[in-house]
Amino acid sequence: MLSPKRTRFRKQHRGRMKGISYRGNHICFGRYALQALEPAWITSRQIEAGRKSMARYARRGGKIWIRIFPDKPVTVRPTETRMGSGKGSPEYWVSVVKPGRILYEMGGVSEIAAREAISIAASKMPIRTQFVIAG
């Protein structure tokens, strides 16, 4: 699963997801892509599940690019803990995704195969997405 090798700070504020994605919203590497239509946090487990399902469907043919990286730590407090005594410890990593962001790209396969592989990956995502073709 994806996670940063090191970060400047162990914990982050939650922040808020306003507006649309102005960066990472064009197809750069492949010919077909999966684009987010809603804002969400996508965990490293979900990214990996989507990648595995696409790779399994494409088998040897084609290449897959992951365009998002989980760089935000999410902290969780232990269960049945009283309020106070600081912020919880980092539990997992998420990628902040805004509408318009390209999640995965694919190339070197036919459109039918790419559409099917990307739809399988889309079913693993917690948001609505769309299939996009470059050009």
UniProtKB/Swiss-Prot annotation:
Ribonucleoprotein recorded as keyword: yes
Keyword NADP listed: no
Subcellular location(s) per record: Plastid, Chloroplast
Keywords, ordered alphabetically: Chloroplast, Plastid, Ribonucleoprotein, Ribosomal protein
GO terms under cellular component: chloroplast; mitochondrial large ribosomal subunit
GO biological process assignments: mitochondrial translation
InterPro entries given in the database record: Ribosomal_uL16, Ribosomal_uL16_bact-type, Ribosomal_uL16_CS, Ribosomal_uL16_dom, Ribosomal_uL16_sf
Record-level Gene Ontology MF annotations: rRNA binding; structural constituent of ribosome
Subunit structure: Part of the 50S ribosomal subunit.
HAMAP family, per the entry: Ribosomal_uL16
Similarity comment: family membership: Belongs to the universal ribosomal protein uL16 family.
UniProt cross-references to NCBIfam families, sorted A to Z: rplP_bact (TIGR01164)
Name recorded for this polypeptide: Large ribosomal subunit protein uL16c
Source species of the chain: Nandina domestica
Gene that this sequence comes from: rpl16
